[in-house]
């Protein structure tokens, strides 16, 4: 339900801490058990430790029971769909169900289309299973 995911992202955006950029971001995702998790960006004077909205959303995922993300979106202050940075694409891949969909500036895409040829947990599991 993209409308419910967008609504959660809009609500999360309201909690963004952005005193430096003034660019709030909200993120939300549907989890494989039906929950919706969300997050907002949290800036820091030491820019390198700023948390993207996807990072706090994954924290919400883990704090509320874990699981795998099946559908995801992030938005700006105007509720326009925006793309995650490279680090966050990798973070999303780590916590995604196979084939996770996401709303992008080019329409609905899978995680594999947004981060092609990614390396993640499934690769490590494949190596471990060959060693057994």
Protein language model regions, located:
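Short beta-strand scaffold segments in enzyme catalytic cores
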Residues: 22-31
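Histidine- and/or cysteine-centered catalytic micro-motif in compact active-site loops
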Residues: 30-32, 41-42
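Short, well-ordered amphipathic alpha-helical segments that serve as non-catalytic structural scaffolds
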Residues: 8-11, 53-61
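Compact, glycine-rich, soluble single-domain proteins
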Residues: 41-55
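Short Gly/Pro-enriched turn/cap motifs at secondary-structure boundaries
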Residues: 17-20
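C-terminal binding/interaction regions
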Residues: 1-15, 64-132
């Amino acid at each position: 339900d993209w409308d419910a995911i967008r609504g959660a992202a809009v609500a999360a955006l309201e909690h963004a801490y952005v005193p430096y950029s003034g660019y709030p971001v909200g993120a939300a995702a549907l989890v494989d058990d039906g929950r919706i998790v969300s997050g907002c960006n949290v800036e820091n004077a030491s820019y390198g430790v700023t948390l993207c909205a996807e990072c706090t959303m994954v924290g919400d995922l883990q704090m509320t029971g874990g699981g795998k993300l099946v559908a995801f979106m992030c938005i700006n202050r105007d509720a326009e769909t925006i793309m995650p940075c490279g680090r966050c694409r990798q973070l999303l891949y780590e916590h995604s169900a196979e084939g996770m969909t996401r709303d992008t500036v080019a329409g609905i895409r899978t995680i594999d289309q947004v981060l092609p040829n990614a390396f993640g947990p499934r690769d490590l599991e494949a190596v471990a299973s060959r060693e057994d």
